[in-house]
Amino acid sequence: MRLAVIGAMEEEVTILRNKLENAKTETIAHCEFTTGEYEGTEVILLKSGIGKVNAAISTTLLLDRYKPDYVINTGSAGGFHHTLNVGDVVISTDVRHHDVDVTAFDYEYGQVPGLPAAYAADEKLISITEEAVSELDGIQVAKGTIATGDSFMNDPKRVEEVRARFSDLYAVEMEAAAVAQVCHQFKTPFVVIRALSDIAGKESHVSFDQFLEQAAVHSTELVLKVIKRIH
């Protein structure tokens, strides 16, 4: 069984990389791939770079070259639900684009023509992640929609515009929908696990810098427990 884990930034992948046995790293088109083993499971760790284009390029390379059975997209996100706080973890039920608008041609908001409006996370991976959560103390975990766009959400007006578009929105970030779209096209099951480094619209740039490391620790802790359970 081969599992891929994708994070955008060094802070989001460094803990897991340091835990891989027999690790080997190669860089293709500025995308960093590290292969190794964790608790008997073959892992491909991808540092994708920030944003949807980087995520799409790197995920395509990942799925074509390494052919993983499952994909986990991890890292940080901005919280969108009123019950959430910095450090909490969100598990995706589905993932959507929040900066795609072809509604003039009768598509749903966020829908890329010819593709689904929402990319559903794999039920098995969601279930395994929920089981793994029970082993974590002091971390609140929620499950819902994660939305993606190529912008950092520190404009309160834009936050409200996006919130009004999606009824069950829990987090926003800059890569997950691109990862999910590529996984859909390759028919590869995925789930997104994101820890909150900020709450969207509330001095986001300040809290992001302060809490990115904490978010990376929380998301990685959960991913490691998922890997132990998945094989």
UniProtKB/Swiss-Prot annotation:
Catalysed conversion reaction: S-adenosyl-L-homocysteine + H2O = S-(5-deoxy-D-ribos-5-yl)-L-homocysteine + adenine; S-methyl-5'-thioadenosine + H2O = 5-(methylsulfanyl)-D-ribose + adenine; 5'-deoxyadenosine + H2O = 5-deoxy-D-ribose + adenine
Amino-acid biosynthesis found in the keyword field: yes
Pfam families assigned: PNP_UDP_1
A biological process term (GO) from this entry: L-methionine salvage from S-adenosylmethionine
Pathway: Amino-acid biosynthesis; L-methionine biosynthesis via salvage pathway; S-methyl-5-thio-alpha-D-ribose 1-phosphate from S-methyl-5'-thioadenosine (hydrolase route): step 1/2
Keyword Signal on entry: no
Recorded superkingdom: Bacteria
E.C. no: 3.2.2.9
GO cellular component: cytosol
Sites where the protein binds substrate: 78, 153, 174-175
Broad enzyme group: hydrolase
Annotated keywords: Amino-acid biosynthesis, Hydrolase, Methionine biosynthesis
GO MF term list: adenosylhomocysteine nucleosidase activity; methylthioadenosine nucleosidase activity
Active-site residues per Swiss-Prot or TrEMBL entry: 12, 198
Function: Catalyzes the irreversible cleavage of the glycosidic bond in both 5'-methylthioadenosine (MTA) and S-adenosylhomocysteine (SAH/AdoHcy) to adenine and the corresponding thioribose, 5'-methylthioribose and S-ribosylhomocysteine, respectively. Also cleaves 5'-deoxyadenosine, a toxic by-product of radical S-adenosylmethionine (SAM) enzymes, into 5-deoxyribose and adenine.
PANTHER family named among the record's database cross-references: 5'-METHYLTHIOADENOSINE/S-ADENOSYLHOMOCYSTEINE NUCLEOSIDASE, 5'-METHYLTHIOADENOSINE_S-ADENOSYLHOMOCYSTEINE NUCLEOSIDASE
Family, as annotated: Belongs to the PNP/UDP phosphorylase family. MtnN subfamily.
Listed name of the protein: 5'-methylthioadenosine/S-adenosylhomocysteine nucleosidase
Organism of derivation: Bacillus subtilis (strain 168)
Lineage: Bacteria, Bacillati, Bacillota, Bacilli, Bacillales
Name of the encoding gene: mtnN
